[in-house]
Amino acid sequence: MVTLITEKLQNQSLDDLTRRACEAGPYSAEKLNKSGHLFPLEISVDKSPWKALRGGWPTGSQAASGPFSVGPHGVSHTEGLKWQLESPGPMDVGHFLDLHDSTGPPAAPPTKRHCRSLSEPEELARCRSPWRPGSSKVWTPISKRRCNSGGSATLQCCSGVGNPTLQGTLVPGLPRRPVSPAGPTSPLTPRPASASSGFVDGSEGSTSSGPPWLSTGPCPFSSRRRLSLSQEHLVDTGACLPSASSTPTSTPELGRHHGLLRCRSQPCVLDGRRVRRKRRREEDARWTRPSLDFLKMTRTLKNSKSLCSLDYEDDEDDTQEKTLVSSPCNSQGLVGIITPSSSPRIPRPGPDSPSIWASGEPEANPGEGGSSGDPSDWDSAGEEGIFPLDHGDLDLEQIENN
């Protein structure tokens, strides 16, 4: 090994030797102090990945600028050689091994750039199972949830005991019919998977005799399985066992009563509930509210003003005319009777002519003298009137007074 190293060193120039030694030596020691592992994946500025072998010699991929091939003893290219020569003695590799095996914390955490690559060496990642966090209120491992909700077949596979043919034939969707090798002496009655709402029954493996395929004793997985079930399955199973004649078809309440309790320990049951569903009160108020048609309202107002009020005026004017003609009165009395009822209907007084309202009868008499006997003038005056609905009361009062 030493002969091979010296031969390769003689073939290199002196300036290349010093440059590469300065790059590889202190940089690798600094990286070792930071990461705490044996050989980090990146050592020099050229970023050549290094891997730790069991022999303790650093090896790596082929260098981009190294002119030599890999040696027969596993030593790679010239950067690895300079890194080995920069160490003070041959016992330095063992010193680094002791540094890696020590359980003390590293001097400094690795930089953020190397967090994923330096988290675990490849040797330990191969033989170790993937990391799973412990169960807590926030994080529930997926394997535990599968064991508890996947039916009896998953639980038998997790326990690792029993007949493999039995474990393969039991499917969570099919009814559970445990085949007992000793005969039909088992007190357990098979129940379908729907009776326990997708979860494993607490009666399986929790009795004193155990499952029928395990005649040696109770299931070793039952205590661990029982922790995740609700309080209903922790009760004595002798009282919870249904009778042999009762089936889920004959007694449909069986599956509901033997299901999981609706409590906080089983949050998956609450998914079917309608929680905090908002009531739609806006739509109800919208349907009860009457719709307003403003065009129709204006149309009816016009019709009522032009038709209804005119009919009332025509009737009242006809009665006035008949009474006036039939009664023996002089012309002055006739003019005096007609004037108060028709005087507000004559012309509409403007803001500059208030004398018509203030003067009273003497000014209204000449205007009404010619049109007193013509009912058509009264109708035309009624259309122009300011108060078309209040004139009836005034007419009756004047008639009674005179």
UniProtKB/Swiss-Prot annotation:
It comes from the Eukaryota. It is found in: Nucleus. GO terms for cellular component: nucleus. A motif (Nuclear localization signal) lies at residues 273-281. It holds the Pfam family FAM53. Residues 336-345 have a biased composition (Low complexity). Signal peptide: none annotated. Keywords: Nucleus, Phosphoprotein. One of its GO terms (biological process) is protein import into nucleus. Residues 323-333 have a biased composition (Polar residues). Belongs to the FAM53 family. May play an important role in neural development; the dorsomedial roof of the third ventricle. This is Protein FAM53A. It comes from Mus musculus (Mouse). The gene is Fam53a.
